[in-house]
Amino acid sequence: MRTLFIGDLHLSADRLDITQAFTRFLDTELDDADALYILGDLFEVWVGDDIALPFALELAEKLKQVSQKLPVYFIHGNRDFMLGKQFARAAGMQILPEVTCLNLYGVETVILHGDSLCTLDKAYQRFRKLRSLSLARWLYGCLSKKTRQGIADKIRSNSKSSNQQKSYTIMDVEPNAVDALFAKTHTKHMIHGHTHRPAIHLLANDCQRIVVGDWYEQGSVLSVSAEGINLQSLPFEHTT
């Protein structure tokens, strides 16, 4: 048996090929799985459970079917931090704290989306602190659907423009932040996404940091079992 980790699918109505690839994954890759963990940014944008698009509602039904066979866990990302209990319940997902510790086949492991580790990106960390406030989230939820969508579109546009000007280092995790989280959680393995740079990093003190990749051009899945870890790519099946 094995436990699977994915993240950064950025599903949207504009990229239904990714949704189709994810659906195939759910149909074919979970027979021997103990659990599925989704480490944030399942959706490209999420402005509230009350305006979920049809493709997202169909996906919720699919995830609900999966959850009847194995547990499905979700950690918020920076694109879908407004995903709430209503959609999670419809999808059969259990929402976890943004930093969660697990014992994976005898190895103490911490999992998270990963944006909190990019501490050199000061502007983003200020925004992240603001949107984590309960009051800010509540006020945002009180806005009209049109206004929320407009704000989300503006944030996405500004983020894309800003990221094009940021250095590779600023947009990656900061080593001191990684070390601090290992020390705080007393873990040996760390699993996260967000950076879109899939890799297995071997660190000091027998620690490992595993980064799951995005799903823009191909799928990325981390499989963890008692035998070890396997970070693999899943090519998309292009149909005509």
From Swiss-Prot:
Binding site for Mn(2+) 2: D41, N78, H113, H194
Name recorded for this polypeptide: UDP-2,3-diacylglucosamine hydrolase
Known EC number: 3.6.1.54
Sequence positions that bind Mn(2+) 1: D8, H10, D41, H196
Coiled coil (UniProt feature): none
Cofactor: how and how many bound: Binds 2 Mn(2+) ions per subunit in a binuclear metal center.
BP terms from Gene Ontology: lipid A biosynthetic process
Membrane topology: Peripheral membrane protein
Organism of provenance: Shewanella baltica (strain OS185)
GO cellular component, one term: extrinsic component of plasma membrane
